[in-house]
Design a protein with these regions (language model features):
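Generic N-terminal targeting/processing segments that precede catalytic cores or assembly contacts
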Residues: 1-109, 133, 242, 249-300
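Glycine/charged-rich beta-loop-alpha catalytic/anionic-binding loops adjacent to active sites
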Residues: 79, 102-112, 155-165, 212-217
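Glycine- and small hydrophobic-enriched segments that form the cores of compact globular domains
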Residues: 86, 113-120, 132, 137, ...
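Acidic-glycine-rich active-site phosphate/pyrophosphate-binding loop
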Residues: 89-105, 140-159, 203-212, 247, ...
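Glycine/serine-rich anion-binding loops at beta->alpha junctions
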Residues: 103-128, 169-176
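Short glycine- and Lys/Arg-enriched binding-loop motifs that mark or flank ligand-binding interfaces
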Residues: 105, 112-117, 148, 159, ...
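Alpha-helical support elements that line or immediately flank enzyme active sites
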Residues: 124-135, 183-188
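A structural signal for small-residue-enriched, beta-sheet-centric alpha/beta enzyme cores
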Residues: 163-171, 175-176, 180-186, 191-300
């Protein structure tokens, strides 16, 4: 059993096992289910992610009932096909898949919460991007999810994964860090390098607020998932290059928890502060719900 990232890394290193294998064995022990049963459940998660990504680029794309989001995954796909991108195709593939997944979520479609529905695009963005470019097998993709879940479980148990409790750092931040760690293992990195990637990725997004316009998981949520995917890929490459993070992963999680607890309620999923509290954000809320609930009036 492990309750911290350090314990996870030590366990994997001492037993000469991958983090994904450690997670599979712990899940078997905790649930008293067979390896085949646990593997099949994770395969279902992977299939759900894949279906959302594929749906997002059918025709003109998917659009939310409000019309606030939709069609950006198709735009990114067409842009990638031109072959003249600034960021490189691997990162932009991740961006496309992340955008698409969250557009499906905003359109009331089926997604896999990783770790939440609002942050459901980042991890699929990363796993399918590197699966494309590195020709990953189905097994490697499933193991990617187990690795990510090991890190995510520690975050959930030791801090928070909901925007209502800790801001978007707890949602997209956690998703990005989980994805970075899993990407490192998938690329052949060590458990310690997975931990470094995790802490780099999460550290980059500390303090990120949750400020959904009109209280809907659309603006800025969809694009934040895309940025989370890019952040994860960059953090993974940094770790694989031998770059380390001065602040250990567990302490980075502690920092996120501390920041989240200090974050005002207006910046924790209430749809009152940040971008939600801008003039444009309030106008959108007024148009959708027909009531003026500006933060300024509530403070009066």
């Amino acid at each position: 059993m492990f309750v911290s990232i350090q314990e996870l890394v030590t366990l994997a290193s001492n037993q000469n096992k991958s983090i994904s294998e450690v997670m599979i064995e712990q899940e078997m022990e905790m649930t008293q289910q067979s390896r085949e049963f646990i593997w099949a459940k994770m395969e279902k998660n992977l299939q759900t992610m894949k279906q959302a990504v594929e749906r997002s680029v059918q025709g003109q794309g998917v659009f939310s009932p409000t019309g606030l989001t939709g069609g950006d995954a198709v735009k990114m796909k067409k842009y990638r096909e031109k072959g003249k991108t600034l960021s490189g195709d691997k990162i932009l593939a991740g961006v496309q898949y992340a955008l698409g997944t969250n557009e499906v979520n905003a359109a009331m479609g089926l997604v896999c919460a990783t770790p939440t529905a609002g942050a459901s695009g980042t991890l699929p963005g990363v796993v399918f991007s590197i699966a494309d470019s590195m020709n990953f097998t189905h097994e490697q993709q499933v193991r990617f999810l187990f690795t990510a879940s090991a890190f995510g479980m520690v975050v959930a148990n030791n801090a928070m994964i909901s925007g209502a409790m800790g801001g978007c750092q707890a949602e997209v931040g956690s998703a990005s860090a989980m994805s970075a760690a899993a990407a490192v293992e998938a690329a052949g990195g060590t458990p310690q390098e997975c931990s470094e990637a995790f802490s780099i990725a999460l550290g980059n997004l500390l303090g990120l607020v949750c400020d959904p316009v009109a209280g809907l998981v659309e603006i800025p949520c969809v694009k934040r998932n895309a940025i989370g995917a890019g952040n994860a890929l960059i953090a993974a490459d940094m770790a694989l290059a031998g770059i380390t993070n001065v602040i250990p992963a567990d302490e980075t999680i502690e920092a996120m928890r501390s920041i989240g607890r200090r974050m005002p309620s207006e910046l924790r999923e209430t749809g009152l502060g940040g971008t939600a509290g801008t003039r444009t954000g309030l106008a959108i809320k007024m148009r959708i719900f027909g009531q003026d609930v500006s933060l300024e009036k509530e403070e009066e």
